[in-house]
Amino acid sequence: MEREGKEDVRKADHKIVYGIERVRHGINNFFDDVGKAVKSESDTADSKRSAEAKADEAPAKM
């Protein structure tokens, strides 16, 4: 009886740890995706500002 109880606790513990790992993995993926989106948006904004700066400089050179 005691052995069965220990086995049940072990299985429950494994399920909890597995669930925590899945949540942690999901959170990491979420922040990776957010980081990529922010970087992409930042790169887009930088290239847009670069293009605008070049366009502003072009008439001044003439």
Swiss-Prot record:
Region (Disordered): 38-62
Conditions for induction: Differentially expressed during meiosis.
Top-level taxon: Eukaryota
Loss of function: phenotype: Elongated cellular morphology at division.
Protein name per UniProt: Uncharacterized protein tam11
Organism name: Schizosaccharomyces pombe (strain 972 / ATCC 24843)
